[in-house]
Structure formats: structure tokens, C-alpha cells
Amino acid sequence: MYPKRFTFDARLIERARVVTLLSSDLNVLCDENRAELPGLAHFLEQGFKARDAEGKLLLPNLSALANRTVGIFSDYGGEDSASRFFTYSFLVCAFGSLDPFKQQMATLRDKSGIGRKEIAFKDFRWGPLRRMLPAYLRLCDSYISGLLFTLVVDKTIPSLFGPGDAETTRRMTDALEETGYGSVAPRVGEKLFRILHCIAFLVALLGQPGQKIFWMTDHDAIGETPEQHRKLLGILNRVLPLYTNKPFSFLGGARPFTPRAFEYLDLLSLADIAAGTIAQTLTSIDTLGEENAQIKDGGDHVLRWLCHNSITLKKFVMTVKRLPNGEVGCGPIDFEARTPIADELFIPTQLVR
């Protein structure tokens, strides 16, 4: 931690207030069915409320500036055997205000020399990509209005939908077969429902009646074929009413397009590098201790960036983990920068909440 420099510029504060949700109802779960909802749903609500109780929760106003479409871009990390955590990252943003970001990213791609290379955590070892990360993250902070939310789940927890026994697996299998999705490995079914319930919760929290909802997920085991992906959207359409009765005008989605459409991939990449960096960092801390943790080159830029919200882009990371007494608990995760950046200014959180 270090002493922060605050600004009280009225124009900046007003700009921040326009794109920030000033009165958010964090009681997302409905009284009628909250007892029937899975543990994950309760952990999500508890996590957001815990962040709010700390006075640190900032949420985006996704209907500001006449935005009519909520874009959700999701990617996941921690699936390698060495990782001790699964991570699920979701960029929930004002889709209608992204044109300036797309224009600036096209320019950055040309200047940085990465051309048509996808920005991905697994490729941080490539010098040109690693060197352009700070500029990319600054553009995200400046031109994306939304929330980057990451859920971290301890791998010792087999399921967030039951005790993880045969009965839990059977219920998930039956639910998938009812939709025509087909049979999948239990780990894929668990992942699928974790992702869909997170999206439903976030849409219930941040979406407004009449808006369109567009979701893009990376090529992944939960939607390997176009037909599977279509059925995946159908399952989301069934899960969403468990969390909200808001009438949305459209619910659709896509996998990454062919040929590559970087105006979408550059948004998906933000979820990719957040999920990858957080999984790798927390695993290293858990294994070696905080002082000896080894952060992947490039990951240091992402961690530093995750420490603070920008005027338009908010960030929130929470965990569901095994407690020392064997129970499962949840709560926010804080990343704290140790050194300042030149010309760095902060708006007091209480002025925009």
C-alpha cells in the first residue's frame, strides 16, 4: 500500500457518477425460490454484499448514455493440473458504447506490431504482446464501461450445486438431458452450470428491462460445436428466470467468429488474461507463500491493473474456498499495489456510490 493522491475535480466526479449504478439492489435472490437455489447463488449474493459492506463495491450503470445491449464476454482459467483454483472471469459491459475502444485497439495493434495475434495469457512469453499489455489495459480502463468480475473456486470443493456425490451428478445429468444438451463428463457439467448461474446472477444484478443480452464465450468444452452452443444458450434461457423476472428483449450469443473479429476478441481477451493471471498467482501464493510467490511475466501488469477501478471499468474478484474448519465460505479478494504510477489520481469512492 502507498499514500494515494485524490482528485475532487467536479467534472471527473460527474462523469464517474453517470456510468456508475448509484442505487443497486443486492438482494438478487428472490424470496419465492431462494431456498431452492444452489449454493453458488448464495455465495455470489454474499460476496457482493460483503464487498458493499466494506464500502468498496462499485457497479456499472449499463443503461447510461442510452445503452440498449449488455455484452458479456467470459473465459476461464486454472484447468491445468498444477493449479489449485478454477477461475471464471466475466466482462459485463455496455455493448453500445464500444466503438471508441474498437478504434483505439485497431491503432494499438498496428503500433505494437502484434498484428492479428490474439491477446492471451498463455502467450505472455512473446515480447511484443507482453510489452503492449500496459497500453491495452489502459484502453480497457478508458473506453469500456462495465464490470470485470472473477469468481475463484478452490479445487478441493467438488461441486457448488450439492455435496459432489453421485446424487449431485445425477441431478446435473438429468437437467442437461431435459434440454437435449446431451451427456457430458461430470466436470464439464459442473463447469457449465457454474458459468450459466454466474451469468444469470450478473444479468439479474446489472441488466435493465427491455435490454438485449449478448454473451460470447471462448471455444470450450461447454460448447464445442455450434449445435451444442445453441443448446447452451437455451439452458441459460431457462436458468435466467430463477434469478429475475425482468423482461429482456433478446438473449443471444456466439463463439469467436471465423475469420477472427478482433473487435470481439479483444474484449474476450480481457476475461482470458484476468482468469489466467489470477489462477496462476493464487496458486503460487498458496504453494510458496505471499513473499515467495512467482508471478508470470506480464501477469504483474494485470495484477497491478486489477488493484483499482477506473471511472468506467469496475473490477471485483471473489472466492469460494474451503475454510480451516472444513466448511465452505466466500468473500472478496483484494490485490494491493505497493508502488504508485506517475500521475495516478483517485476519486474518493464515497463520492460516486
Regions found by a protein language model. Give the residues of each.
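Phosphate-ester processing/binding pockets and catalytic centers
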Residues: 2-71, 76-353
